[in-house]
Every structure is written in structure tokens, then in C-alpha cells.
Amino acid sequence: GAGVQRALVSAWWGPEGPLLSNDHVAELVHAHPDRFVGIASVDLKRPMDAVRELRRRVTEDGFRGLRLLPWLWELPPDDRRYYPLYAACVELGVPFCLQVGHTGPLMPSEFGRPIPHLERVALDFPELTIVAGHIGAPWTAEMVFLARKFANVYIDTSAYRPSRYPAELVEFLRGRGRKKVLFGSNWPMLPPSTCLGDLPALGLDDEATRLFLHDNAARVFGL
């Protein structure tokens, strides 16, 4: 009832195995292809299996991206174990999604610091589209800087309602960054309706609102 037409649904894979499997996401997507778009997750400890799994999910199940959580693996995104997957994402034409910023669970936050870790990935893989979720707090200014600097680096606002966006993100969203920020809720943690209810407070014009809520995601994920 929140007026959401389509949602990206991500698998979750950590060192102990899948918390939400690619198979489960594929079932959901195949049952409701007009409503849901799949995002894969893989086992970083098995790099070639991970590449094969990503390729299979994109080519056979129509998944539109890869998502990994550096804090869950306790490996920053510039660790060599990610690099075969970045090459595969470029070849497959899908974005790499990750969490930046602090962690909610009691785990180290350092793996989510945008500079130097994510900047190094953007430098090493200029063709890789990167979608950085959870806005990067307490380093949101660093995340905005990277989104300004690199054509293929984007921010998604999952896990934050608009009333909690830092001023530098709101300024970026209203102005030069209107094509670089994607709306997200992080459901079930935050209902989309809660995030959408806060939207008027951002003071976005019609174009910025359309880009934020729809057009940027449609472009980045090839929807």
C-alpha cells in the first residue's frame, strides 16, 4: 500500500552460509516478475564458485546485481577476494551493491569506510557500477565525495528515513547529485511507507523526486 511498483530483493550470504538464499529470491522473482527484481549474493571464500553462481543467477534467473556486506565478512571491499566478482559484474553489465558506513550489529565499522576502501575499487574498476547503501554515515561526506568524483558510483538511502539524511546528502540530492542517489528503505527494518512519508521535508523539485524514486534505479539496474 506504499505505492511501490517494483522492489529489489537481495539474497544475504555470510561466512556461515546463506541467510537468505539465491534460490529463495529466484522463487520470489519468478512468482512475481512484475513486482520483484533479484540481487544475488555469493560465498567470498570460494571465488570461482562465486563467479559461476553470479553468472548463473544473472543469465538464467534474470538477477540484476550482486550485493555483499563487507562488515559481515570482515573484509573491506578492496580485498583481493572481491576482485574476480568485480570483473564478472562488469562483463555481465550489472552493478555491485554493498553497505557503507557503520554497522548496526556489534561488528567493526571500519570495513564500511568509503575512503580508502571503496575509492580504491572505483579506481581499479572504472567500468564497474557501484551502489553504496546505507548512505555511509558517519562518513556520508566521504560517500558524497566519491559519488561526485566517479561517474559510476551511486548512493542508495536504504536504512535511513529522509528526516535522518545528513545535510550534505540532502544538498547533493537536491542539486548536482540528483542523478546519483537511489531511494531505498531496507525493509523489513524500515517500511517504504515510512520513508515515503518523510519525503516532502527534503524539498525536492519534481525532477529530483522522479529521479530519486524511480529513474535512477531504473537506469542503474537496467529495469
Briefly describe each language-model feature range:
Residues 25, 29, 57, 66, ...:
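Conserved, mostly hydrophobic/aromatic
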Residues 60-65, 85, 91-95, 124-128, ...:
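Glycine-enriched alpha-helix->loop->beta-strand junction motifs that scaffold or abut catalytic
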Residues 153-164:
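His/Asp/Glu-enriched short active-site or ligand-binding loop at hydrolase and phosphoryl-transfer sites
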Residues 9, 68, 98, 132-133, ...:
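Conserved beta-strand positions
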Residues 19-20, 108-116, 140-149, 165-172, ...:
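Histidine/acidic-residue-rich catalytic or RNA/ligand-binding cores of hydrolases
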Residues 1-6, 55-56, 177-182, 190-223:
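Mid-to-C-terminal alpha-helical segments outside catalytic/metal-binding sites
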Residues 134, 156-158, 172-193:
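Short acidic/histidine-rich active-site segments
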Residues 5-6, 13-112, 149, 163:
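Active-site gating/metal-coordination segments in enzymes
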